[in-house]
């Protein structure tokens, strides 16, 4: 009871200050949207989405909206790393976070105690990564 009483009296937001304002956030979003994505990376994202829908363990995979979210997150990842372009590892890094809560496992997966994280890993491992040319 004492813990409940004390928690109601405390101001848990005291000492918390914003690290950026709305304008700064909008600027970051704009910068991320301008990140370049090669057609090969776009195809890779589309293949990951297709593989998520056709996987033996899934009832539902990435929808078109989920695919758009994956694209936006890959661009944001590249931007945060200081690059002006997306590489396959950006997609691989964000795919588990974007896909895990969108993939619905089928009954077979539930019976066999397959975890969505395993399916996400399987999709990443079985989908061919695009080869991008490096400048010499």
Residue ranges and their predicted role:
Residues 15, 23-35, 52-59, 103-110:
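Short hinge/gating elements
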Residues 54-136:
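C-terminal engagement/docking regions of AAA+ P-loop ATPases
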Residues 1-47:
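Conserved AAA+ ATPase core "coupling" helix
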Residues 8, 36, 49-56, 78:
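Alpha-helix capping/termination and helix-coil
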């Amino acid at each position: 009871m004492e813990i409940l009483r004390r928690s109601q009296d405390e101001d848990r937001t005291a000492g918390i200050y914003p690290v950026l304002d709305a304008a700064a956030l909008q600027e970051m979003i704009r910068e991320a949207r301008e990140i370049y994505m090669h057609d090969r990376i776009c195809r890779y994202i589309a293949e990951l989405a297709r593989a998520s829908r056709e996987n033996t363990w899934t009832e539902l995979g990435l929808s078109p909206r989920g695919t758009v979210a994956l694209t936006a997150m890959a661009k944001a990842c590249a931007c945060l790393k200081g690059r002006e372009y997306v590489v396959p590892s950006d997609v691989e890094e964000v795919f588990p976070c974007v896909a895990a809560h969108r993939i619905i496992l089928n009954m077979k997966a539930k019976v066999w105690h397959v975890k969505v994280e395993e399916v996400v890993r399987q999709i990443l491992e079985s989908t061919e990564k695009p080869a991008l040319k490096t400048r010499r």
